[in-house]
A protein has these predicted regions:
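Glycoside hydrolase catalytic-domain context in secreted enzymes
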Residues: 1-785, 792-809, 825
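Short beta-strand elements
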Residues: 810-825
Length: 826
């Protein structure tokens, strides 16, 4: 069927719809599906959370229908590899189809305005051009599988502080130059099927009601022809949202549409044209997805593909950033080592993802300890000490820690855990989050559940257990109440702000003895979804740091695995500090003092301060790398993969140095983007503030030389593109990859402009001694700024400098040209 024939079918169906049916298409039927209209053969479409895995409708924790867990957004973007990102997108499209979904709720392209943002891990960068390029690759990959991407969150959802109500206050120039480009590219270059509006307001108007942004810019100016959906419960009105361009309210059943919207049309408060346009867009997406021919009817599947495992491992290692490598301590060589000390809270924990809606129940995970044990075999002695913890709430009790490697979960159709069991299943985790979908036969309006397992502790002493829940919960050991979150719950940050604070209880247990664990739960007073989480912490020695230092002192090399996790970095709340949690900094200092051959493997989604940096020999930023966590880290440590990742965000020396510091998080319902266009490295360069690590920085086990920079012309006419070429040589004996970065500086600007703006990059592979000629291109828009008076892009006549290098501060070659004439661009 041709595009014209498909549009004809859309129009033919639209003409047959009643007003009530059109309106029904404008809201979800349930948490994940739109409304079907059987009389006309119009199926529902199903959406699934991304962006680092297609979860489906099940719980992101321990669900039997697992999913491939890919690296988080910042890790993918740190590869600076468009082709790789597109491959990841295609794999996620394949994963979405295993869950019966026609649309993936991804990618997340909000800008890293502040290093404290709880969702920075999920987004790509502080730079709009890099974010746009990564988004385009991701979307093209997803949609190559006939699954629609949904770029989010439109717009300026750049922190989690009061995200449902706060107003982001900014100028048009700031909006155009920094925050809109990823969405513009997603629409114009990648033809995204979907856009999701944000919760916040922009200059006083909620995103879902903002006619200037939704209609004026997104649909009319950019030409977006897909569906614009709300974030979940992010619709704020009946009339304004419908009139101003919000096509789909999610989730269902509707709160704002239905009969209320029909009445608003009948009373002329909402234009019929707006209803027709929204329904048309919904039908168009159903058509594009092929759902008319193949509606989703199959149950969700977990298909663990070997090629996806390999891709996840490559994407993870290619995105890791080598920050320090004194005396080439890395890569490690097995035949030169007798012992390695593995120290830190992340050695035996796979920190694969951040928190919030991006979470998935992974097919499998591998920890650094498990992977390194396989890599070194019997040749190298591995010692382990935890040293300290890094949790915000007690670590989740996983099924592999209990007898039989599984939890039993039983459901009851009442709040008292009485009468017959309605449904039972096994879980891989002590956590359950029910986003709309629930087990067969269970009444979602009123149910209770019991999670049980037998447990044999490895050590004697005081063991801690904890509960966090949306609803009532209590935890018992051999029938004894240990943690009571049933009698009273206090609201906390967990589960997007709907969950309770953590309730912790302790009990003395004996090593080797079998205990019966039971978590009881009911969903009374639950607003949107049900959830519980069982945390556990075994006894930790009071001298744990000293024990770690002793182990380090008697080892050839020490690897310290530290960072944050999905409790610290999550949707729903921001961080409050750039410090590593708990005593991790003290642990690194003490271990490095005991053994100077110390390498820190850092796992965070955002910058942290590093007061210990000068005392360690090496640092790797491994991020949250997905299910191949341990393997991808091992690949970097032992040189199976030559590190080629580059930072996508500036790491400040201290929190106070970041440009958003003065205006973060906002007050009186507003946050002023006072730094304007000077976000990230633009600010550090302009104000000459020295960062800990600059944007675009990343070391390699190889070395590269830049030479012969040439411009296509020294006098550029208006409307012309500029060709930029140079030679890059691998001057080392090891094959490697280099990211060549091109920045532009408008030397003679009449307005304040950054000293450097990233406008082009490419990633190349070079064999030892090999030279490649790199060709990059600057288009007229790359030279322009947004003029608030003309409401247009303006490229001013005068001298421009082209700067090419390995990072924003490691500039290897420079050249200049003159733009002959000032012009306003369309």
């Amino acid at each position: 069927m041709t595009i014209l024939e498909k549009e004809d079918r859309v129009e033919a169906l639209l003409a047959q719809l009643t007003l009530e049916e059109k309106v029904s298409l404008m809201a979800g039927a349930n948490f994940w599906e739109t409304v079907a209209i059987p009389r006309l053969g119009i199926p529902s479409i199903k959406v699934s959370d991304g962006p680092n895995g297609a979860r489906g409708a099940g719980s992101p924790f321990g669900s039997s229908v697992t999913a491939a867990c890919f690296p988080v957004g910042v890790a993918l973007a740190s590869s600076w590899d468009r082709d790789l990102i597109e491959q990841v997108g295609a794999a996620l499209g394949q994963e979405a189809k295993t869950k019966g979904a026609q649309m993936l709720l991804a990618p997340t392209v909000n800008i890293h305005r502040s290093p404290l943002n709880g969702r920075n891990f999920e987004c790509y960068s502080e730079d709009p051009y890099l974010s746009a390029q990564m988004a385009v690759g991701y979307i093209k990959g997803v949609q190559s599988e006939k699954v629609g991407a949904t770029v989010k969150h439109f717009i300026c959802n750049d922190s989690e502080f009061q995200r449902n109500s706060i107003s982001s206050e900014l100028t048009e120039r700031t909006l155009r130059e920094i925050y809109l480009p990823p969405f513009e590219a997603a629409v114009k270059l990648a033809k995204t099927w979907g856009v999701m509006s944000s919760y916040n307001k922009i200059n006083g108007v909620h995103a879902d009601e903002n006619a200037e942004l939704l209609q004026g810019i997104l649909k009319n100016e950019y030409g977006f022809d897909g569906i614009l959906m709300s974030d979940w419960t992010g619709t704020n009105s009946t009339v304004n949202a419908a009139n101003n361009g919000l096509d789909l309210e999610m989730p269902g059943p509707t709160r704002w549409r239905g009969e209320a919207l029909v009445k608003a049309v009948e009373t002329a408060e909402v234009k019929l044209e707006a209803i027709d346009e929204a329904a048309r867009r919904m039908l168009r997406i159903i058509e594009r997805s092929g759902a008319f021919e193949q509606p989703h009817t199959e149950p969700e599947q977990a298909i663990d593909r070997p090629e996806h495992r390999a891709l996840i491992r490559k994407a993870a290692s290619d995105g890791m950033v080598l920050l320090k490598n004194t005396n080439n301590i890395l890569p490690l060589e097995k035949d030169k080592l007798k012992s390695i000390a593995l120290i830190g809270p992340n050695v035996k924990t796979a920190q694969i993802m951040g928190g919030g809606s991006a979470q998935v129940s992974a097919h499998y995970v591998i920890t650094p300890f498990e992977s390194l044990k396989t890599v070194v075999g019997e040749a190298v002695q591995l010692g382990y000490e935890i040293g300290c913890t890094n949790h915000k709430i007690l670590p989740k009790l996983e099924a592999r820690a209990v007898n039989g490697n599984t939890f039993k979960l039983e459901y009851f159709n009442n709040h008292e855990l009485s009468d017959e069991t309605i449904h039972s299943e096994n879980l891989k985790s002590g956590e359950l989050l029910l986003f709309g979908e629930i087990a067969p036969g269970v009444n979602p309006a009123e149910f209770s559940a019991r999670l049980s397992a037998s447990f044999t502790p490895d050590s004697s002493g005081t063991h801690q257990f904890s509960l966090v829940s949306v609803g009532k919960s209590r935890f018992l050991v051999d029938g004894q109440m240990i943690a009571d979150n049933w009698t009273k719950q206090i609201k906390g940050e967990s589960y997007f702000g709907f969950g309770s604070t953590e309730v912790i209880g302790s009990i003395k247990l004996e090593a080797g003895k079998i205990y019966n664990l039971s978590l009881e739960y009911n969903n009374s007073d639950v607003p949107l979804f049900a959830a519980f989480r069982l945390g556990y912490l075994p006894p930790i020695a009071s001298d744990a740091i000293e024990r770690a230092a002793t182990l380090a002192a008697h080892s050839d090399v020490t690897l310290v695995f530290v960072g944050t996790n999905g409790d610290w970095e999550s949707e729903g709340h921001d961080r409050t500090s750039l410090k590593l949690p708990d005593e991790q900094a003290a642990l690194i200092e003490r271990v490095a003092a005991a053994n100077p051959n110390t390498v820190v493997v850092l796992q965070t989604g955002s910058p942290v301060v590093m007061p210990w940096l000068e005392r360690v020999a090496g640092v790797i930023q491994a991020y949250f790398p997905g299910q191949e966590c341990g393997n991808s880290i091992s690949d970097i440590l032992f040189g199976t993969t030559n590190p080629s990742g580059k930072l996508t965000q500036t790491y400040p020396l201290r929190l106070e140095d970041n440009p958003a510091f003065i205006n973060y998080p906002g007050d009186n319902g507003r946050v002023y983007y006072g730094e304007g266009i000077f976000v990230g490295y633009r600010y550090y360069e302009k104000k000459q503030v020295t960062p800990l690590f600059p944007f675009g920085f990343g070391l390699s086990y190889s070395s590269f030389e830049y030479k012969n920079l040439q411009l296509g012309t020294n006098l550029l006419e208006s409307g012309q593109s500029l060709k930029v070429s140079l030679d890059v040589t691998n001057t080392s004996p090891r094959a490697g990859q280099e990211v060549v970065q091109l920045y532009v500086h408008d030397i003679q600007a009449s307005v304040s402009r950054p000293n450097k703006e990233l406008k082009a990059f490419t990633k190349i592979h070079l064999e030892p001694g090999e030279t490649k000629t790199v060709t990059l291109r600057l288009d007229p828009r790359d030279l322009a700024y947004w003029d608030d008076l003309q409401h247009a892009w303006v490229a001013e006549a005068g001298e421009f400098e082209v700067l090419v290098g390995s990072s924003s501060q490691d500039i290897r070659s420079r050249a200049s040209f003159v733009l002959a004439k000032t012009s306003a661009l369309g």
